[in-house]
Amino acid sequence: MTGPTCLAVVAGISGVFVFGALFSVAQIYNDISSFADNAHRELGEFKGFANDAWNSMVNHDDATRVARSVFVRRHKKHSQCNCGPQASNCPAGPPGPPGAPGDRGLDGQPGGAGNPGQPGVAGPKSHEQQECIKCPAGSPGPAGAPGAPGPQGPNGQPGHPGQGGSQGPAGPRGPAGDAGAPGQVGAPGNPGQAGRGGQRSHGLPGPSGAPGPQGPSGAPGQPGQSGGQGQQGPAGPAGPDGQPGQPGQDGQAGAPGNDGAPGADAAYCPCPSRSGSSSAVETGAAEQGYRHRAVAARHRNVIRRRVAKKRVVKKKRVVARQA
């Protein structure tokens, strides 16, 4: 294999690898863009679930306030309190979420009239004519750039005719002329005298003559019998591995997971025990709030599991393509 052929082969292989690298980069960029779009969409869904949970919690707080107001009114009617011991030295609970934005305020009243301004100052009665200030002349500026060439001038007057020159020296000898035409054929000569009788002898055979020209091609022969079918050759070696195939489509979303176990109680003070119908009202409101919180927590867990699963699938695809 010659040098140019080797160079062409190496250049072709390098071009194939470069094209494959560019294709891989484009695929990775496409996967990253798809992953970012999916993440934004899932974050939007999660935000919607969070807003729904927050609205349900706000509604629960309103219901709790109503229940508390009913309990307070009933508590004022009783002469005696059967409540348990009140808790003391309780740590402050975590700050609640920000409230909903309030309504826009009313426009302000128009302002009053401003105070009168200061009296103006009288100007001069007459203007004096002043002479202009004469400044000394400055130094001359630098030379300007050369101007454009002017137009072409008119043609000059024709000159006087020149005088005749003297005879020049003899030139060099020229080359020999061409050969002349061949002369005419001379007249035939007179016949010569008869020769004497020579001795006869047999000479040696002369050398072989040159081979003659090749004869014409003969007529085509009869077609021969067809040969039998040859035996099948051995199997060739296995070819190189092909390019990795296109990634498969995303599988269907899995079924939502089972409900999580209820969490442990937070670090809040224990509520005092109550008796009567007021405890039943607050117990029902507390159970309703717990259901809302459990539903919101279940939605958050489902979304987190989906996001984590999709991230693992994306990472596996990127690793498979790089390999």
Curated annotation (Swiss-Prot):
Biased composition (Gly residues): 108-117, 159-168, 224-233
Region feature (Disordered): 80-293
Superkingdom field: Eukaryota
Keyword entries, A-Z: Collagen, Cuticle, Disulfide bond, Repeat, Signal
Any one GO MF annotation of this record: structural constituent of cuticle
Region ranges (Triple-helical region): 93-125, 138-200, 203-265
GO cellular component: collagen trimer
Comp. bias (Low complexity): 136-146, 169-191, 234-267
Keyword Disulfide bond included in the entry's annotation: yes
Signal sequence segment: 1-28
Primary role: Nematode cuticles are composed largely of collagen-like proteins. The cuticle functions both as an exoskeleton and as a barrier to protect the worm from its environment.
Polar residues bias spans: 80-89
Assembly and interaction partners: Collagen polypeptide chains are complexed within the cuticle by disulfide bonds and other types of covalent cross-links.
Protein family according to the UniProt entry: Belongs to the cuticular collagen family.
Protein name: Cuticle collagen 39
Disulphide bonds in the chain: none
Family annotation (InterPro entries): Col_cuticle_N, Collagen
